[in-house]
Amino acid sequence: MNIWQRSARRADKRRRKQETGMTWINRGRAFAGCVALAGALAAAPAGADTGKVGLDLPLLTSPFWQSYNRYLLHYAKDMQIDALAPVNSNGDPAQQITDMNTLLNLGAKGIVVGPLDSAAIGRALDAAAARNVPVVAVDVAPTQGKVAMVVRADNRAYGEKACQYLGEHVRRGKVVQIMGDLASVNGRDRSEAFRACMKGYPNLQVLEIPAAWKGDVAATALDSLLSANPDVKGIYLQAGGVYLSPTLQTLRRKQMLYPAGDAKHVAIVSNDGIPQEYEAIRRGDIDATVSQPADLYARYGLFYIKAALAGRTFKPGPTDHGSVIVQRAPGVLEDQLPAPLVTKANVDDKGLWGNTIK
């Protein structure tokens, strides 16, 4: 039995509650739903779901996106989707537009993309729409252009969960949020939600580092900030995949890295749910992370593109896989997948994708 089969079997047996009270996605049901959909599509008229699907990755320097890529390839095969080789836009919004056009020229009849820039991606979406090629956006919602579905988690909840954890565990002093790219709706949502939530903790002072999802930028800025503010008590990393390693290296170099429980410990909450974050939680280097569902991003990105190619449409409301579809804007639907807070108390949960991918 391979890792994917073991993961699916374990997930089939687990129905857990998130700390927010939201029901965890029953991965077994979700998988069954994908299989059922695949069967339904197979019975559709000839040509209804035929054609190659293009896969555009925003970057591959982050362990999160590396994991997402592996899940994409697995589920594309499992769902019998004829996928073109994934293209890596390498963190460059302009390159992503070029890559999307390349996929169209290669004959893609549908595209799954992780947008880098919420506005800039609109040009590529318009090009796809001109050829009647449906697009599913994963992780980042576009602010312009047409998509069949947006698949992401509630990114405002990421910022709120990080704020609440730090607010409850730091109590007083300075906290830093290392922000993502504010050209991305994800960066804006997390930053704004963290900032707004922190107003409820008047004894905490928020310092900010705009790092645009770049680890080297985060490291340099954090080094300078800590030199001027050696009394920082907490840090929020908006993307553990790119910020975790440089943050820990900077704290270690400044002799500020102490394990959780030590009076000198700097509390850290991250986002992503990658295996490296879980190991850092177990060591006591960081305290928590919000697990972005890389597995479900891939699964449902492909689910919705196959549905779009078969002519299926959806409406706002609860889904059969534990999430909620909301209307972001007129004609733009978003399937908001749950993302649990992971701490030392539940870091070994085998239902978390970061504990199953190898």
Report each predicted region and the residues it spans:
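Flexible loop/hinge segments that line or gate small-molecule binding clefts
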Residues: 118-157, 165, 171-174, 274-280, ...
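Extracytoplasmic "Venus flytrap"
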Residues: 52-71, 75-79, 84-99, 108, ...
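Hydrophobic alpha-helical
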Residues: 101, 109, 113-129, 194, ...
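Short beta-strand elements in bilobed, periplasmic/extracellular small-molecule ligand-binding domains
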Residues: 78-89, 177, 198-215
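Short, solvent-exposed amphipathic alpha-helices that sit
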Residues: 64-79, 158-162, 185-204, 221, ...
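Hinge/cleft segment of the Venus flytrap/periplasmic-binding protein
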Residues: 197-198, 300, 304-358
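Bacterial N-terminal signal peptides that target proteins for export
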Residues: 17-33
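Hydrophobic alpha-helical segments within soluble ligand-binding/sensing domains
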Residues: 96, 151-175, 188-189, 217-219, ...
